[in-house]
Amino acid sequence: MLMYGDFAGMYDPLMKDVDYDSWAEYLLRFLGDEKLRVTDCACGTGEITLRLARAGHIMTGVDISGDMLRIASEKARRAALKIPFVEQDMRKLALHRPQDAIICACDGVNYLDSLKAAEEFFEAANAALKVGGLLLFDISSQYKLENILGCNTFAE
């Protein structure tokens, strides 16, 4: 994950076509209107974290890249949102209190490099959730990775 140090400054321009508003709207359908304590794992530069905070949720952003989190923190500061951003490996979540929900959007789980790493994340997320809490995540399937993305290059 060290690659995100140099990459952090280029991440948002490269991801400009991601529809973060739709992502947030989709997640909000599951989270509902009640103010929840939510942790966004693999939050990157905080785009989804910020949107869910604006919707009224008590957010924490977690990412392994301090450089990505510095950008996320600056965005939150400019938006006058108080969001703690924590540099840690999502496989070893160490949160101060149980969470109502944990999210890991935009293929964050796909960045884990083994089945064991994924299991560690799911176990850590389960331990960090309140009883009955929600874990919301998405993944790109092996079919998508091999047959849709494959060895294709996507560029403008």
For each feature predicted by the language model, list its residue ranges.
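Conserved class I S-adenosyl-L-methionine
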Residues: M1-L36, E47, L134-E156
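A short acidic, Gly/Pro-enriched loop at the edge of an enzyme's catalytic core
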Residues: A94-A101
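A short glycine-rich, Lys/Arg-flanked "PGG" loop and its adjoining helix->strand segment in the class I
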Residues: E119-V131
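Class I SAM-dependent methyltransferase SAM/SAH-binding core
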Residues: E47-K92
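Residues lining the SAM
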Residues: A105-D107
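Class I SAM-dependent methyltransferase "Motif I" SAM/SAH-binding loop
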Residues: A42-G46
